[in-house]
Amino acid sequence: MATKRLFGATRTWAGWGAWELLNPATSGRLLARDYAKKPVMKGAKSGKGAVTSEALKDPDVCTDPVQLTTYAMGVNIYKEGQDVPLKPDAEYPEWLFEMNLGPPKTLEELDPESREYWRRLRKQNIWRHNRLSKNKRL
């Protein structure tokens, strides 16, 4: 009994478990605590889903044509430092300028012996199977 009051623990089937905490203000009385008090947010309205009043601001957009043609703007990932300077075209690999930046090619435009053809064919068959199986009843 004395250890129960002193240490605030009881013997349970699983082992020693916390029972109640001692209240230092009142000696000898035990105080049961519940969950912690919910934090109060500044500018928040009462109720669920209250939005704070802080608004996000957009990043600064560079409009200087000299900087836009000599630096890769917005590529620097560090807080401090400069943007990456652009190199001459001869220093970049050749495949970089051969990339298809437009819409993807259709099956008729691709060579049947290429890997891209078979990947595209497999993707279209998966899309077709998903469309057909969406309407099936269980």
Curated annotation (Swiss-Prot):
Protein location: Mitochondrion
Pfam families cross-referenced by the UniProt entry: Ribosomal_L37 (PF08561)
Keywords recorded for this protein, A-Z: Mitochondrion, Ribonucleoprotein, Ribosomal protein, Transit peptide
FT transit peptide: 1-14
Stretches of the chain forming a coiled coil according to its record: none
Domain of life: Eukaryota
GO molecular function: RNA binding; structural constituent of ribosome
Cellular component terms per the entry's GO annotation: mitochondrial inner membrane; mitochondrial large ribosomal subunit; mitochondrion
BP GO terms, sorted: mitochondrial translation
The protein's assembly and partners: Component of the mitochondrial large ribosomal subunit (mt-LSU). Mature mammalian 55S mitochondrial ribosomes consist of a small (28S) and a large (39S) subunit. The 28S small subunit contains a 12S ribosomal RNA (12S mt-rRNA) and 30 different proteins. The 39S large subunit contains a 16S rRNA (16S mt-rRNA), a copy of mitochondrial valine transfer RNA (mt-tRNA(Val)), which plays an integral structural role, and 52 different proteins.
Family: Belongs to the mitochondrion-specific ribosomal protein mL54 family.
Name by which UniProt lists this protein: Large ribosomal subunit protein mL54
Gene coding for it: MRPL54
